[in-house]
Amino acid sequence: MSGFDRRSFLKASMVTAAATALAACASSERATGTTPKAAGKSVMGLVVPKMDEVRVGLIGVGERGIGFVHHFSRIEGARITAICDTDTLVLARAEKAINEYGRDKPAYFSKGDHAYRDLLNRDDVDIVVIATPWAWHHPMAKEAMLAGKHAFVEVPMAGTIEELWDLVDTAELTQRNCMMMENVCYGRDELMVLNMVRQGLFGELLHGEAAYIHELRWQMKEIDRKTGSWRTAYHAKYNGNLYPTHGLGPVAQYMNINRGDRLDYLTSVSSPSLGRAAYAKREFPADHQRNQLKYIGGDMNTSLIKTVKGRSIMVQHDTTTPRPYSRHNLIQGTNGVFAGFPNRIALENGGSGSYHEWDENMDAWYAKYDHPLWTRMGKEAEENGGHGGMDFLMCWRMIYCLRNGEALDQDVYDGAAWSAVFPLSVASVGDRGNSKDFPDFTRGVWQTAKPLGIVG
C-alpha cells in the first residue's frame, strides 16, 4: 500500500469508527436535555503535541474571513496552506493579499458548496478556521475534526442543542480542539477586567450583564452577497437572542463558567418586532422580497441566566433599534462593580473615594491592571487591527498555544454553553418566558476543572 493510500485508508477508518460511535450517542437525548453517554474522554484542558509550524486551512474568506488571511500571514509560526470559498471574487481578493505578503501560494478551492471537503482531505492542514454563514458552522467543524484537524469556528458555534452536543461528542471522540473564536474575550478592556476579577478587586462575584446591541438594519440591503443576504432571514424565523456570545463570553470567563460554576437555566422575553418591518417599508418597494418577510424576532430580547452557584447574568440582543453600540460588559461583586460602554468603575474602597459615584478616569486602572497578555502584545495587536486588536491577539494566542503545547483559552464546552443561549432563548420566548435548562456539556467536569488563569 502506498503512503498516500495508507493515509487515505487510515483517515477513512477513523471517520467510519467515529461515525459509528457518534451514532451511539442518542440524538433524542441530545435534543431533550438528557445528558448523553460520552463517546470519548473529556477535552477539558486538552493539550496536543507541539507544532513547529501551524498549517492553516481557511474556509470562508469573505467579510469576516479576509481578516484571518491578513492575521495568519503576519503571525510567526503560522502558514496558510489552503483556502476555500464558493465566491470567486473574495477568493481572488484573498489570493491577492497572500501574494502581497510574499507568502507561499496555498491551494484554492471554490467549486460548489462542498469544495471545503477537498481542503479537509489535505495532509498539509493542521487547523481549519471556519468563517462561513452560521448554518455551515456545525457540519464544517464536525467534518474537520473527523478529518483529524483542529476546528476553529466563528460565532455562534452551532444553532441547536443537538448540534452543540454533536460537536462536543466529536471533539471528545477525536481528541481534537473545537474552539469557537470569541474574539471579544481578547479585547483590552475585557482582559483587564478578567485580571481585576482574578486579583479579587470586586470581591465575590454576584451578577453580570452582557449584550450585543448593534444597529444592523442596513444589512437588509445586502440581497445577493455579504452577511445580510443570509442573516436577515433569521429575524423572520426566530424570536430570541440570535447572537449572544460577544457579550456573554467575557462575563462567563470572569465567573469561571465551566471551571467551577456553570450556566444552569435561563428565562427570556422579547419586545414587539417592529423595526425591521418599518425599515423594509421605508427602504424597499412594496413588492420587494424584504417586504414579503414576516419579521417575528423582537427588536430587543432580554434573557436572564442563573448559574449553579446562584449568580445572575442578563444578556440582551438588539440589532434593530437606533441606539449606540454596547456589549454592557458589567460585572458586580460584593466589593464593587465595573461597567463598560463607557468604561467606569465603583469600589467600596476604590480610587474615587465613594462607590456612590462612578470613576470614569481609567488611565490609572489600565496602568495597574492591564492584562499581561495585552502588556506583551497589545501594541502589535493594535497595529495589526481587527476590532481594536482583539482579532489579531486571538489568532496570535491560538498559534502560540498550539506551538507551545498549551491548552487553548476557550474550548468546545465554552462554545457550546455560550451558543446555547440562542436555542434556549427561542424556546423560552415561545413558552411565555418559562425557564429552560442548560445542558451540562462538560458532563460534570466543570466541578473539578481548573479556573482559566492569567496568561501572558
From Swiss-Prot:
Can you tell me which residues bind substrate? Y212, R231, Y243, P244, T245, H246, Y325
Give GO MF terms, alphabetically: hydrolase activity, acting on glycosyl bonds; nucleotide binding
- InterPro entries reported in the protein's UniProt record: Gfo/Idh/MocA-like_OxRdtase_N, Gfo/Idh/MocA_oxidrdct_glycsds, Glyco_hydro_109_C, NAD(P)-bd_dom_sf, TAT_signal, TAT_signal_bac_arc
Look up the signal peptide feature and give its range: 1-33
The set of disulfide-linked cysteines is none
EC numbers listed for it are 3.2.1.-
Please tell me which top-level EC class this enzyme sits in: hydrolase
| PTM summary | Predicted to be exported by the Tat system. The position of the signal peptide cleavage has not been experimentally proven.
**Per the annotation, how and in what number is the cofactor bound?**
Binds 1 NAD(+) per subunit. The NAD(+) cannot dissociate.
Question: Keywords in UniProt for this one?
Answer: Glycosidase, Hydrolase, NAD, Signal
List required co-factors: NAD(+)
Report if keyword Cell inner membrane is assigned: no
Task: Provide the binding site for NAD(+).
Answer: E63, R64, D85, W134, A135, W136, H137, E154, V155, N183, Y243
Q: What does this protein do?
A: Glycosidase.
Record family assignment: Belongs to the Gfo/Idh/MocA family. Glycosyl hydrolase 109 subfamily.
Recorded hits in PANTHER family, A to Z, give: BCDNA.GH03377, GLYCOSYL HYDROLASE FAMILY 109 PROTEIN
Output this protein's name.
Glycosyl hydrolase family 109 protein 2
Q: Organism source for this protein?
A: Shewanella sp. (strain MR-7)
